[in-house]
Regions:
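S-adenosylmethionine
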Residues: 1-466
Length: 466
């Protein structure tokens, strides 16, 4: 028999039960519940376009996930991250072991295969454990039982040849849906687009914004000081709340790119500043730490509670307002306004690898329209001569450059207040010809890609002239 799997032949035969092959009663196999949950959640992401964060919330997530113990929850998160970061590469490897396509309605089977392959290709899970649990999973599910032999053969073939096959596939496959790759290429050109998609395959580091002495904290935590003053850690191996400085409120978690928009407001000590769509509060903390009188506005009570807890830990204060920005009338104007608008979040792919699979071009158009409405509302809160910074974590110009250009075309009472690359450390190479901020996961490259990059962000600084 050839190395490729004869699909029809595998359908008609089932392997005999042998210890360790996954043919034992499914309920007796440790780890099977976690793999079932991973396959179920993978289906929810790629088939139903359900955001992963909600599915894996420890308190309110998918019941199959929340029923697991903390260790298995962490495993499920790791499996899903690997399966989504490398979705098309895994799919290509699976296809290479089949002599014909799987049936059109074999979604559950594919999810089982992807979950197993992600473990032995990209995680520190023994080949035999991943394969045996996948076989047990397939044999216990009536929808996939007849494919048990195929699952066993495909996965064992992949595991045997992974050292040779995986590098070739990774070098020739873009692990992103076509619509996303095409929009990146149109916006940034093929070279930068490929660099962004390559960065998506690597887990993002842990970035911290510190209140004082970033160099000292970088040394104390075993991290690196980034050009903008962010302290960066790679795989710290310690839960965030247990890291030095957390309990004392010395720092907060914030991607390096996310820390830039608040700084674009300039010196805010003693100024009245509105932070709109403020939760969970990283930018509010920056502004308060810089001496601003901050009004933090958000429409979500749950997110504002989290913001309040974060500020309390940091020993910072702000006026916290729950309101719909479209109808909020504070009765006064602000010296400066920061609007970090809800968006497609395509710039956060390293942290949220589901985004490219749960969003679509239609979603981007709808979100851009919603952001324009928020920008119109925010503009009415700025005093004459005051600054307005509009930002989001999208890589798409429809939500950034083109949106701001349209706003300025229709609003003669506002003008662009161009950002200078020399305003503060870390901006070099991140400011475009119009004076807007644009970051991508391909920025700040270093030899070890684990230390490279940042979230994709856009920010424009505007000034009210009338």
């Amino acid at each position: 028999m050839t190395e490729r799997v004869a699909t029809e032949r595998r359908r008609k035969t089932r392997p005999k039960a042998k210890p360790g092959t996954g043919a034992e009663p499914a309920a007796e196999m440790p780890g099977l519940a976690a793999r079932r949950a991973a396959a179920r959640l993978l289906a929810a992401v790629v088939d139903a376009r359900t955001p992963l964060d909600g599915l894996t919330d420890s308190e309110h997530g998918n019941p199959q996930f929340t029923a697991l113990d903390p260790r298995d929850r962490a495993l499920v998160r790791a499996i899903l991250a690997a399966a989504l970061r490398h979705r098309l590469s895994i799919g290509a490897l699976i296809d290479s072991r089949l002599d014909r396509p799987l049936p059109a309605r074999a979604g559950t089977l594919l999810h089982i295969l992807h979950v197993a392959a992600a473990q032995f290709l990209f995680l520190d899970v023994p080949d035999s454990a991943a394969v045996n649990l996948a076989v047990a999973h397939a044999s216990a599910d009536p929808r996939t039982r007849r494919f048990t032999g195929l699952v066993n053969a495909v996965l064992r073939a992949l595991a045997t040849r992974k050292e040779r096959a995986l590098p070739k596939v990774l070098a020739t496959t873009r692990d992103a849906p076509d619509w996303f790759a095409e929009r990146l290429i149109a916006a940034y050109g093929p070279e930068t687009a490929d660099a962004i998609m390559a960065a998506h395959r690597i887990e993002a580091p842990l970035d911290l914004t510190v209140r004082t002495d970033p160099g000292g904290w970088a040394q104390r935590l075993g991290g690196r000081l980034m050009p903008n003053g962010t302290v960066r850690l790679v795989q710290p191996g310690t839960p965030v709340p247990e890291l030095a400085g957390y309990a004392e409120g010395a720092w907060w978690v914030q991607d390096a790119a996310a820390s830039l928009p608040a700084r674009l407001l300039g010196a805010v000590d003693g100024c009245d500043v509105a932070d709109l769509c403020a939760a969970p509060g990283g930018k509010t903390a920056q502004l308060a730490n810089a001496g601003a009188r901050v009004t933090a506005v958000d429409g979500s009570a749950n997110r504002l509670r989290r913001l309040a807890v974060n500020l309390e830990r940091l020993g910072l204060s702000a006026e916290i307002v729950r309101a719909d920005l479209a109808s909020w009338r504070p009765g006064r104007l602000f010296d400066a306004v920061l609007l970090d608008a809800p968006c497609s979040a395509t710039g956060t792919l390293r942290r949220h690898p589901d985004v490219a699979w749960t969003k679509s071009p239609a979603d981007i158009a709808k979100l851009a329209a919603a952001q324009r409405r928020l920008l119109d509302a925010a503009s009415g809160l700025v005093r004459p001569g005051g600054r307005l910074v509009f930002s989001n974590c999208s890589l798409d110009p429809e939500e950034g450059e083109r949106l701001v250009a349209g706003f300025l075309d229709e609003r003669p009472d506002f003008c662009r207040d161009p950002i200078a690359p020399t305003e503060f450390d870390g901006l070099d190479g991140l400011v475009d010809a119009c004076g807007d901020l644009r970051t991508t996961p391909a920025d700040w490259p270093v030899d070890d890609p684990r230390w490279s990059g940042m979230d994709g962000f856009f920010a424009a600084r505007l000034r009210r002239t009338g």
